[in-house]
Amino acid sequence: MKMPDPARRERQRALIERGIETPFFRDHIKVFDKAFGEMEAQLGKTKWLASDMFTLADVEITPYVERIDRLGLAQMWEDRPLLADWFARVKARPSFKAIEDFPPTDFYDDTGRDGLKDWPRIKQMIAA
C-alpha cells in the first residue's frame, strides 16, 4: 500500500529509521502525553472513557496505548493511576487477546528495550 502524502511518508520513514532522534518526535510524544492527561481526567469522572460502559471510545484508543506500552514507554502513565487501571482492565478483556497475538512479540523485543533505555531523554522532551 502506497502512502499518498509524501511528507507523511517521509516522517514515518524517519521515525522508523531514527526514532527519537527525528526532529518531530518531541511533538508526537507530547501529543500522546496530552491525550493521556485528558484520559486521566475523564477516568476521574467515568469508569471507561465515554461512560461507565466499555464503548467505541475505549476500542479506538487502545491500539495507541498498547503501542506505547510495547515500545517500553508505559512510564508515561506512572503518575496517572486511573489510566494505568483503565489499561489493566482493557488488557483483561477477552477481546484484547487478538491484539496481543499480532504482530509476533519478538518484533517488539528490541523496541521495548530501546524505549526503556531512552525513557529519561523522552521524559525530558515531554517536560520541555
PLM region spans:
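GST-like fold's C-terminal all-alpha helical module
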Residues: 1-88
